[in-house]
Amino acid sequence: IPHLYVPPITKVEAVHGFSYGSGATIFPQALAMGATWNKNLTEKVAMAIGEETLAAGTMQAWSPVLDVAQDARWGRCEETFGEDPVLVSQIGGAWIKGYLSKGLFTTPKHFGGHGAPLGGRDSHDIGLSEREMREIHLVPFRHVIRNYACQSLMMAYSDYLGVPVAKSKELLRNILREEWGFDGFVVSDCGAIGNLTSRKHYTAKNKIEAANQALAAGIATNCGDTYNDKEVIQ
């Protein structure tokens, strides 16, 4: 926002390295890092990624992935640290610690339950009970929010109990903020708010309704074109 002297926040995925530019180090995928069970090594890898990311002029990393992979058919298992919530919590926490030590914004994702889509179909209904969600899939997020100064968090594409996470006050307000005390900002996964107007969810007739639903749930930053649509802004 130039007239307010508010600079842009530049970001990168950085799931296993600063992948948006040539010359950066590409480290093993998260699943391989999880298999080491080595928090010290993981922290050092994250520190190296943090240095290279900041050197490139980027201040925010959309990682680590704290999804607990529960279905081998899911095509994004390699982005996760594994199938055990304790392992994901510990390795994910070490990763965040490494980022923060270098001054890099960290954005753990995808909150919540993204690692258990029905039939292994990415981004679809996760079909989890409240107990499964709380005792398995929310554990890593609760751990890092309570133990590290995470500045932001990315929500998931999925539905939970029939409600898209992009408009879920239960997940994004009641649990995340009121129960856990998270005081950072929530980023939408790319296109997730726009999906509220599509056949995938169809809880909104247009972008204005979609934006209102997402804002009411507590999503501050939109990866996509909904929040910056002219009609929405007006």
What are these regions (language model features)?
Residues 1-234:
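Glycoside hydrolase catalytic-domain context in secreted enzymes
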